[in-house]
């Protein structure tokens, strides 16, 4: 009988623990996305196996840790493309990509164009609206 009474508490504690872990994961990613981190590094940083870290992260956000890191990097890269005169190579490395080839491939996958094309399109749009 005591086991049954403890089961719901265990379920709640697990949910609370998962919430805490997800917060730790997102904080770690936000503080380190510009480094060459991988999902394994994130799991290690919060004391979890990477598969479990990915599982609870996907349950919470509907995306994998790797995709979340890529989205965050691309968002920051777009900001830098539009607000600085940095080279694409410098932006790639500053946003955590280990090569311009990887940056271009990831950018293309997410935005269906290269970083250079993206900047050119937005520059044209801004000139037209002036």
Specify the residue positions occupied by each region the protein language model found.
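C-terminal edge and immediately downstream basic/flexible tail or linker adjoining helix-turn-helix-like DNA-binding
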Residues: 124-130
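Basic/polar phosphate-binding segments, predominantly the helix-turn-helix DNA-binding elements
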Residues: 28, 36-72, 92-118
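An amphipathic alpha-helical interaction segment
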Residues: 1-13, 17, 52
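Residue-level recognition of oxygen-bearing side chains
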Residues: 86-87, 102
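A short, Lys/Arg-enriched amphipathic alpha-helix from helix-turn-helix/homeodomain DNA-binding modules
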Residues: 10-37, 43-46, 68-86
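Hydrophobic recognition helices of helix-based DNA-binding modules
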Residues: 1-6, 29, 57, 81
């Amino acid at each position: 009988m005591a086991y049954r009474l403890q089961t719901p508490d265990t379920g709640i504690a697990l949910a609370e623990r998962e919430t805490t872990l997800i917060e730790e994961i997102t904080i770690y990613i936000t503080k380190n996305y510009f480094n060459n981190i991988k999902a394994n590094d994130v799991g290690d940083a919060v004391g979890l196996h990477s598969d479990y870290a990915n599982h609870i992260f996907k349950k919470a956000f509907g995306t994998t840790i790797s995709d979340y890191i890529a989205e965050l990097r691309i968002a920051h890269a777009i900001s830098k493309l539009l607000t600085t005169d940095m080279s694409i190579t410098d932006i790639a490395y500053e946003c955590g990509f280990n090569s311009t080839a990887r940056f271009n491939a990831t950018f293309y996958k997410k935005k269906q164009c290269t970083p250079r094309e993206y900047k050119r399109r937005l520059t044209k749009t801004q000139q037209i609206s002036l």
